[in-house]
Every structure is written in structure tokens, then in C-alpha cells.
């Protein structure tokens, strides 16, 4: 049997596709393209959080005006549209873990958790329940057949590359998902929106974390976890106490501005000692990292990760969403997975992701990745930090 444009067997008119519609231009264009190609399209929008503060806020997502925009687009395209209340699930799977992660001294990525649980688990099951053959989204990433399964690849428009946030997508999910925008540049997507007469053609892209009004994540975390605003010491990596802070929630590893102490030297946040409510600062050199240890690894390579050679596997790694993939070596032994960064990186924060690729081109395959559990700095800085943490543990035990 021949395959249609979504690599599914059969004619497009016999293929039902659920489109995850956020109310933005990207997912709206996906619905429009698939409808134009003759697919049986069903739009689904998730209400993920209390939209009171976001009803009229530009750059929000999945609340208030966005839901109305998705409804209007669906109506104009002549497709059924459903709004599902996932607010409780979103709080449980995304917002609470986000706050817990910050309290523990990490810098989490809620978009990964949202994709991993709410969008690509719960919504995917909803799509199956609706009898859909696939779930399509407006993410900028590509997938194509790889043997009996499908594999992920970076998009044509690398400025919009969302693969960093999709590393945790499982093989089962990848096989069911479709990403029609992966081969299109953003400018062309907006042109298509104009051609289709979509009311969201000029709508601003979503910004920051969707459930955080004005990007002030510290307000939400402090409300959910008041202990995150507990004051504590600002300590130099060499052991000197330099001042006080108003809660580790206001800091992240690599931060330079707004630290709250003036010593005449450039200082950066090197580590967040959540157990002792301390912000550890130091010179830029103390941020240099060549090795990161991963947890919750989602490996999408063809060879099982446990079967990697002792010499490791040459890959390219991204430790920030805004950075291009850089040369690295992936290793796995004794149940641990780590990545050695050939050129090093600065300011790597626990809780962030390390995503792995075959190369650094826009055709690179995504091999998955993991969350950064810890990193190793340059030997001198690593020893100073270990000594500082050990002394704190002794003081706490005394």
C-alpha cells in the first residue's frame, strides 16, 4: 500500500490526525496544511493552568485568549475542536516538579516535562481514544522512517530548532507523532498562515515559561515553596562569606548580574547549596566544565547504550537550547552515563538537559539525552568546591 504525505498507509481522506493546537501560528498552520491536503483533522487544545493572569498577555500559551484563537482557527478551517481541562494534571506533572527542582538548587526545564508527560503521553492517549492515526504538532523538528521505526532530526530552520526540548520523547511516541513544519523556515510558515487566511498569522510567538506571568518564575516558586525564599549566606568558593541573599530561588548557576555583593572582582554563581541555603560564587574559571553526568537518560540510538564501546561514542552535545551542538564523547559504564565535552562549557546547571546529536548540521539525527545531575569543573575549582561542601556537612553534623 502506498504511503501518504505523513508516511502513513492509505489515502489522506481516510487518515485521521489530531493536531495539538496551542492557539499560535505554528500549530494553526499544521492544522491548515493537513486540512488542505485532505486529512480528517481534529483540533485539540489543552487548558493547562489558571488563565486569569494570562488571558490578555502576549506570548502566553494554552490559556485564555490562546484557547479562543485555537477555536476560531478551527472554525475557519471547518474542523472539530475540543478543549480539554488538564490543569490538575499540569500542576502535578509540570508545575510542582518545577518548583521542587528549584528548591533543590537545580535549574529545571518545564517545557521538557510538559512534552514528556502532558503533551506526548496524556494527549497522545487522547488522540488514540479519538481514533486518530497520528498526533501532529507545530514543533520545529523532523522525523522520518528508520527501519521499522522513526527517528528524530533537527529542522531545516535551526533558529527555531526545538529538538533540545524533545529529547525525552520515547520511541513509541516518535512512531505516532508527526511534525509537518520540520522542513519549513518560520518565515514560510507565516506566509502559509496568510494564504490560509488564519487570524493568527501575525500573532506573536510564545515567550518564556508559559505559566509564569512576565517571566517572574521566582514569584510562583516562592508561593508554592516558601522555603525557596529563605535567606542565607553568599560564600566565595575559597570559603569567604561575602554577604547574604534573600533566597536561592533568585539565583542560577552561571549568573553574574544581581548577585548582591560587591568585591571589586567579577563573580559568578558557581553552585547552589540548597541544603545549607548558600549561594556559592567564584571567578569565571570556576564555571568551566568538561564532564557532565546524566540522569533519566532517554537513548534513541540504534545500538543500546549499555553496548557502547569502552572508548565511548563520538557525538555532538547541546547543554543549552540556544547553543549549537558541539563535539563530545558519550560514555556509559557501571550504570552511569556521562558526556565529555571536548571544548568544555561554562556555567552548566544541574537540572538542565544535555541533548545528543550525530553531528552539528541541520540534518543531524537526535540521539536523545538526559538531565544533568552533576558536572565536574576544572580540578582546582572542583577540589575547592568539594572542600567547601564537606566543611558545611561537618558543621551541620556537629
UniProtKB/Swiss-Prot annotation:
GO molecular function terms attached to this record: ATP binding; tRNA binding; tRNA-uridine 2-sulfurtransferase activity
Amino acids binding ATP: 20-27, 46, 138
Keyword tRNA-binding: yes
Site (described: Interaction with tRNA): 139, 352
Cited Pfam families: tRNA_Me_trans, tRNA_Me_trans_C, tRNA_Me_trans_M
Keyword terms: ATP-binding, Cytoplasm, Disulfide bond, Nucleotide-binding, RNA-binding, Transferase, tRNA processing, tRNA-binding
UniProt-recorded name of the protein: tRNA-specific 2-thiouridylase MnmA
Taxonomic source organism: Brucella canis (strain ATCC 23365 / NCTC 10854 / RM-666)
Lineage: Bacteria, Pseudomonadati, Pseudomonadota, Alphaproteobacteria, Hyphomicrobiales
Amino acid at each position: 500500500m502506498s504511503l501518504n504525505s505523513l508516511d502513513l498507509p492509505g489515502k489522506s481522506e481516510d487518515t485521521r490526525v489530531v493536531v495539538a493546537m496551542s492557539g499560535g501560528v505554528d500549530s494553526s498552520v499544521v492544522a491548515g496544511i493537513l486540512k488542505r491536503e485532505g486529512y480528517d483533522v481534529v483540533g485539540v487544545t489543552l487548558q493547562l493552568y489558571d488563565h486569569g493572569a494570562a488571558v490578555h498577555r502576549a506570548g502566553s500559551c494554552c490559556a485564555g485568549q490562546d484557547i479562543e484563537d485555537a477555536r476560531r482557527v478551527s472554525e475557519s478551517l471547518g474542523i472539530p475542536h475540543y478543549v480539554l481541562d488538564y490543569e490538575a494534571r499540569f500542576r502535578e506533572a509540570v508545575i510542582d516538579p518545577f518548583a521542587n527542582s528549584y528548591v533543590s538548587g537545580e535549574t529545571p526545564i518545564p517545557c521538557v516535562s510538559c512534552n514528556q508527560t502532558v503533551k506526548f503521553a496524556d494527549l497522545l492517549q487522547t488522540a488514540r481514544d479519538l481514533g486518530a492515526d497520528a498526533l501532529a504538532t507545530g514543533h520545529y523538528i523532523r522525523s522520518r522512517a528508520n527501519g521499522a521505526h522513526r527517528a528524530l532530526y533537527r529542522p531545516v530552520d535551526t533558529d527555531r530548532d526545538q529538538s533540545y526540548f524533545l529529547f525525552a520523547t520515547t520511541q513509541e511516541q516518535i512512531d505516532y507523532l508527526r511534525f509537518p513544519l520540520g522542513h519549513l523556515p518560520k518565515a514560510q510558515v507565516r506566509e502559509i498562515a496568510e494564504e490560509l487566511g488564519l487570524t493568527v498569522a501575525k500573532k506573536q510567538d510564545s515567550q518564556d515559561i508559559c505559566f509564569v506571568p512576565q517571566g517572574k518564575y521566582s514569584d510562583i516558586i516562592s508561593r508554592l515553596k516558601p522555603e525557596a525564599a529563605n535567606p542565607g549566606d553568599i560564600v566565595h568558593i575559597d570559603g569567604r562569606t561575602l554577604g547574604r541573599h534573600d533566597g536561592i530561588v533568585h539565583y542560577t548557576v552561571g549568573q553574574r548580574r544581581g548577585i548582591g555583593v560587591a568585591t571589586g572582582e567579577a563573580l559568578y554563581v558557581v553552585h547552589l547549596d540548597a541544603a545549607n541555603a548558600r549561594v556559592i560564587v567564584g571567578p569565571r574559571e570556576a564555571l568551566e566544565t568538561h564532564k557532565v553526568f546524566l540522569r533519566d537518560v532517554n537513548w534513541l540510538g540504534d545500538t543500546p547504550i549499555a553496548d557502547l564501546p569502552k572508548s565511548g561514542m563520538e557525538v555532538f552535545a547541546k547543554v543549552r537550547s540556544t547553543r549549537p551542538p558541539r563535539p563530545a564523547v558519550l560514555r556509559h559504564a557501571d550504570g552511569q552515563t556521562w558526556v565529555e565535552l571536548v571544548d568544555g562549557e561554562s556555567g552548566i546547571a544541574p537540572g538542565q538537559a544535555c541533548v545528543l546529536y550525530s553531528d552539528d548540521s541541520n540534518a543531524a539525527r537526535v540521539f536523545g539525552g538526559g538531565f544533568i545531575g552533576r558536572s565536574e569543573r576544572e580540578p582546582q575549582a572542583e577540589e575547592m568546591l568539594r572542600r567547601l561542601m564537606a566543611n558545611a556537612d561537618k558543621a551541620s553534623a556537629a
